UniProtKB/Swiss-Prot annotation:
It comes from Arabidopsis thaliana (Mouse-ear cress). It comes from the Eukaryota. The chain crosses the membrane at residues 239-259. This is Probable LRR receptor-like serine/threonine-protein kinase At4g30520. It is an enzyme of class 2 (transferase). Residues 260-648 are cytoplasmic. Residues 1-30 form the signal peptide. The modification Phosphotyrosine is found at residue 473. Its main location: membrane. It is found in: Cell membrane. GO terms for biological process: anther development; homeostasis of number of meristem cells; leaf senescence. GO terms for molecular function: ATP binding; coreceptor activity; identical protein binding; protein serine kinase activity; protein serine/threonine kinase activity; protein tyrosine kinase activity. SMART domains: S_TKc. The lineage of its organism: Eukaryota, Viridiplantae, Streptophyta, Embryophyta, Tracheophyta.
Amino acid sequence: MVVVTKKTMKIQIHLLYSFLFLCFSTLTLSSEPRNPEVEALISIRNNLHDPHGALNNWDEFSVDPCSWAMITCSPDNLVIGLGAPSQSLSGGLSESIGNLTNLRQVSLQNNNISGKIPPELGFLPKLQTLDLSNNRFSGDIPVSIDQLSSLQYLRLNNNSLSGPFPASLSQIPHLSFLDLSYNNLSGPVPKFPARTFNVAGNPLICRSNPPEICSGSINASPLSVSLSSSSGRRSNRLAIALSVSLGSVVILVLALGSFCWYRKKQRRLLILNLNDKQEEGLQGLGNLRSFTFRELHVYTDGFSSKNILGAGGFGNVYRGKLGDGTMVAVKRLKDINGTSGDSQFRMELEMISLAVHKNLLRLIGYCATSGERLLVYPYMPNGSVASKLKSKPALDWNMRKRIAIGAARGLLYLHEQCDPKIIHRDVKAANILLDECFEAVVGDFGLAKLLNHADSHVTTAVRGTVGHIAPEYLSTGQSSEKTDVFGFGILLLELITGLRALEFGKTVSQKGAMLEWVRKLHEEMKVEELLDRELGTNYDKIEVGEMLQVALLCTQYLPAHRPKMSEVVLMLEGDGLAERWAASHNHSHFYHANISFKTISSLSTTSVSRLDAHCNDPTYQMFGSSAFDDDDDHQPLDSFAMELSGPR
């Protein structure tokens, strides 16, 4: 018989508690809490059918979704953007999207997503852009959407939404763009605060007055036609004669039209056949897809003018739709007789295809025939920074700062991480594109000259845009990385002012040279006079001042005094700006150093007349007289005047 004492029992109970505590602690430590954003995104993915694997790298065991495709995160690693347009997604949109409370943009347009729009979207207080257009959503528009107090851009067009017109949308305070066209909504349309809204294609809606025609039905009385026999045979004969004559004319017109159409089609087929033979030396370029001219002709509707996205110095860019539904941008190069030969063109294509960075426009394909050169890029649904600066709603300050940093990182990659390095030579707002999540993407670098490590510059014909061209490039045709840095500085001024460089120059034409005037306002701490009025008071004054300082550093007259793009990125991110700004004051050219009377009097009459002639020179108008003053180069004023006279 076993006798259990009190002491033994206490020891056993203590051991039991210790064992249970150890098991609980082990379970707690071994099961790391899951990120609620990961759970929400996985639920969204599981509700969708993804035929092209666009969401394949969404890992349910991951704790950080910021590296996933189609996801944009804030600097604090919070999910702020979900963008998967034109991915052929189907299925339903999970209500778990309401758990992504930091979302600012949702872009799921041009898919086949069906079912009801989840009311949980109303739980996203920071949402600014919601685009569910061109899907198969049905049912009512959830009333909870009126709770999106930050919403500015709403597109639900081209779905199968029904029910009464959502009058509650008029209560969203900041809504500036609304498109509900081509659905099955009914009832009266209230007044909206949105600057732009579209309700076309909803057959059962009507204006708010008068209400009696808003029942959603159309009453039509039958059409009655009476024929009187009293008109006699003469009227019948006349009618028959007119009918025969009219029919003959119609048949003749149709015959002529058919003949012209046939001739035009044969001519087009002949052109297609002539252009459809790929150059033998340009076939099979790595990962680049080779298109035939006939394919691109079909994808762009015959290079229709309605599909033109933009026109530049290298040619037109057309919107295209591939056979699988993917949207692309097709650049059709002009003046190909002046382009390099097959070997040089092949080398440039290969180098461009290796320049892969999230802030660079990726080349995905090409077409090269004896008469055509075409490049195929991904379609950027939000256009260019230049167009967004002119559209409504205006880009907010945080977005402008994000664009500046993204563009700077793209140029840094071209300058310091490509081998051989690539010079863009036309950095401007029109060449900075915005993807579905408003991430800055540098475009048109694919047509830049490649810079060999053995060279410090490339001498060639001047290419670029007036107002963005660096002075040394304009005067000598010599470009370098610092040429791009100058253009980037002008881009920063465009982001600050909301104006193109030429528009900005006209604005300040009565106040002196553009950059000289900017520096003066900065010295006098009147930065607000430069700011885009569309920003209102929604900006950080310190950040604006810092960006302006970076712009002024980038646009210094001498290339050697401008920072490298790696330094520009650090300064925009808040590192090293103060030191660089202080060091810049050691350059006598940076601020006003007016030409002394002694210097001018020592010039010959010819030299003075040369200097006077530059009052109308573009470089003089940009830099002012301070551009002529520099002790570092020890060059006479005459040589500077010669440099500023433009390309020879």
